[in-house]
Amino acid sequence: MSRVAKAPVVIPAGVEVKLNGQVITIKGKNGELTRTIHNAVEIQHADNQLTFAPRDGYADAWAQAGTTRSLLNAMVVGVTEGFTKKLQLVGVGYRASVKGNTVNLSVGYSHPVEHQLPAGITAECPTQTEILLKGADKQVIGQVAAELRAYRRPEPYKGKGIRYADEVVRIKEAKKK
């Protein structure tokens, strides 16, 4: 049985929560996020807290309640503080730049790679070899970071490629003669 669902999500000041059936909308200074809740989960909104309870008749109700609690907590953190993800470009001549909502990458192809950012996500390049993604939706930030990384994943012999800032690339030993 999940213990995650037993902890309530505290709603800070300045965050507005609307519960309409199984659709919840959380609005804060960084934007508005909406999510549809699984039928196995029942949510109560009282005195600046969201509490979760499983519904009878569902085998995975406690698991769904714990998952829902984690997702809604991430939504609350996203609309108040926001999320960031940092990518590094490692390799000779690998560069990144941001123009509007487009990330331009020079990562060893014969042409520059242009990646359109979805709504609600902003990117900046503190240096030519770093990309900083910011936004309110944790899932979308991770998805965009994974898409950018997929253009040139770190290779195991020299470590060249696009990597997450906290990623450790294991380097293989070269073949001996």
UniProtKB/Swiss-Prot annotation:
Keywords: Ribonucleoprotein, Ribosomal protein, RNA-binding, rRNA-binding. GO terms for cellular component: cytosolic large ribosomal subunit. GO terms for molecular function: rRNA binding; structural constituent of ribosome. GO terms for biological process: cytoplasmic translation. The keyword Membrane does not apply. This protein binds to the 23S rRNA, and is important in its secondary structure. It is located near the subunit interface in the base of the L7/L12 stalk, and near the tRNA binding site of the peptidyltransferase center. PANTHER family: 60S/50S RIBOSOMAL PROTEIN L6/L9 (PTHR11655), LARGE RIBOSOMAL SUBUNIT PROTEIN UL6M (PTHR11655:SF14). Belongs to the universal ribosomal protein uL6 family. Part of the 50S ribosomal subunit. This is Large ribosomal subunit protein uL6. It comes from Proteus mirabilis (strain HI4320). The lineage of its organism: Bacteria, Pseudomonadati, Pseudomonadota, Gammaproteobacteria, Enterobacterales.
